[in-house]
């Protein structure tokens, strides 16, 4: 499947070392002012080569819109866009054409398709997420007009964890450090860890926390159309994700029911709200009007700049030595991707309701 969404739909295309990455957005309402500076700014957050913590692949990632825009506004027709690939070093992958790299998609793609583009991971590369960020930026622009804001940040790298709740951190600090952690002291520790593993030719994983603020009551459907399930599906479609939980999540197993229920009361404005939000803003698969917050776990990058044993397509055991340019940790560049997938999911359900 290369299409995401039911009403607000994105179909992405392209491979890591192909001519370009792009997409077609269907179902976008007409009359939306397309803030190009904002859209490009979102792309710049996931762009490679932005700091010493990311791959040195030097791509400008400038988006070109091909259709669906007139006089700076959407016109309700399919929005086509493209981002050209300009800095491929495909020769770095010549020796890997017949090799199954550990914990990559090489083996499964070979078994499923037999013929595929192995360069830079081809279609399985995180470069595909360019299309998601463009579509997510447009979704954000629409949601902002509805009072809905999506914010994500790095809350853990390896064993370095930001233990504070999202309500205790200053979101304005997120873009102040290369690792996109809002706690500046914890961020320094995260950066030091990433630099340390990079020097050893190794990699490290972590967790991104995301908050959807201002989501109205009623988004989502019972049983198989749950908003929580849709968010999980969206997040687990991102490269290198290995886990998703929302609200108190897995930590809830340590609580008793009397410690985990969100009690209702009427606030000073006469609105029914809850005293806590252990449920993460979703009850019965339907948004409750409270903040929706969740966490996404990312594995360490599978490409290591150190030798590993593997096999080739004929089953011969070989010592794998990898070249190329790779992230020691995907977390900093994955923040805008998580936000984009959340924005598209929330907007898709919003358009269904309204």
UniProtKB/Swiss-Prot annotation:
NADP(+) binds at residue 46. Belongs to the chorismate synthase family. GO terms for molecular function: chorismate synthase activity; FMN binding. It comes from Azobacteroides pseudotrichonymphae genomovar. CFP2. This reaction introduces a second double bond into the aromatic ring system. One of its GO terms (biological process) is chorismate biosynthetic process. Homotetramer. Pathway: Metabolic intermediate biosynthesis; chorismate biosynthesis; chorismate from D-erythrose 4-phosphate and phosphoenolpyruvate: step 7/7. Its cofactor is FMNH2. GO terms for cellular component: cytosol. Its EC number is 4.2.3.5. NCBIfam families: aroC, PRK05382.1. Keywords: Amino-acid biosynthesis, Aromatic amino acid biosynthesis, FAD, Flavoprotein, FMN, Lyase, NADP. FMN binds at residues 123-125, 239-240, 284, 299-303, 325. It catalyses: 5-O-(1-carboxyvinyl)-3-phosphoshikimate = chorismate + phosphate. Transmembrane segments: none annotated. Reduced FMN (FMNH(2)). This is Chorismate synthase. It comes from the Bacteria. HAMAP family: Chorismate_synth. The keyword Methyltransferase does not apply. Pfam families: Chorismate_synt.
